[in-house]
Amino acid sequence: MAYHYPPVQSAGIERTRHFLRYLPDFGYSAQVLTTSAFGGREDEGVLRAWEPLAAYRWLFNKEARGGRAPSTNRTRPGLLRRLGRLCLVPDLQVTWIPFAFWRALRALVRGKTDLIYSSYPPASAHLLGLLLKRQTDLPWVADFRDSWIYDPLDPELQESPYRWALETRLEEAVLRSADAIVVATEAVAEHLRLTYPKAAERIYVITNGFEPGDFPRSDPPPVGDPLRIAHTGSFSISHSQRTPQPLFLALKDMLADDPSWAQRLHFDLVGALSEEEQRAAQGLVEAGLLHLEGPQERAEAIAYQQRAHALLLVDHARPWVSSNVPGKFYEYLAAERPVLALGSEGMVQRMVRELQAGVFARADDPVAIRKTIEELYDCFCRGELAVRRDPHFLKPYHRRELTRSLAQVFDHLVQS
């Protein structure tokens, strides 16, 4: 069960797409159950279940109309959305469950199935998995990827005690019933093991990763050029809490103190920016320090990474220790460029430190961001930014190797 699936355009589908690509290498063929809300052809390997709220999202969500995965978050939600988030728990996709459930049951009756697998987000996919587990007693793998309750993708969850309490009970039901729980970071695993000790032995970490063929090795630009830093992808359009605004403030402060930074530093932002982000960036664009490229095909976005000396990663700051790592981080590892990571204390900071992947600053602190950029520039001037990673270091993050780990979880359940 993978709600987000092509033709949807989303970084989140890459994990599922590559699992499906490589599972046959390890003896598994899969049939996908997804939504019909975004169109797409139904064929032998893909079932698409109708959902009543598809029309609602098409009317009120520009990303859905454009074939992109709808953002899980919104700032300043309208009345309809606020009402929907109060009544439709755990998410708007809950109306997909009854139709997907019957579609799945028909498929299970017609063919031999060894196990079922559900992919979060949305959390409704896990509720669908829970229903199918109770109906069929087949082994069930629930892939949480990121945290549902502790470090939620949806900021509105923290603002509703009613939803928080209800969804905590739903998470508990999933953890109690799933035969295996897969997560994408050690921090998520540690939290779930502490919260649900009876499930501890059923929790497995399978990180996100990259496809090595997408990242041919390349040398960075010459040191004599300006320090070029690239970011590929969007900010608040895909995750409302992620914002480049503190970065922009830091850069404006640097320019105000020393206009020569416009010749020494250059940022390429390759991806969709909101109107608010574009307005905030305008002065930096006019100064020549910032270039807004807009959305690009994947190959061209990777080319921008390879033309850069360093790569920008932006996560949002939290008042607690973060548990999630943006999937972009692993692609940046493959690009073999140091990472300028902006986030909060937690998993991103931990990964940058443990893998010696680059430098880190808190995402909501323009002063710290400025200091970190200046330190990065000093390293650049000394010729100390070059990164060459041992291929064996990167191999555990290859998509095929990660699929091997998932297949081993499947093997354990099927054989037992």
Locations of the language-model features?
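A short, active-site helix/loop in glycosyltransferases that binds the activated sugar's phosphate group
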Residues: 172-202, 349
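Conserved donor-binding/catalytic core segment of Leloir-type glycosyltransferases
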Residues: 221-244, 248-249, 402
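A charged, aromatic-enriched C-terminal amphipathic alpha-helix characteristic of glycosyltransferases
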Residues: 364-368, 381-412
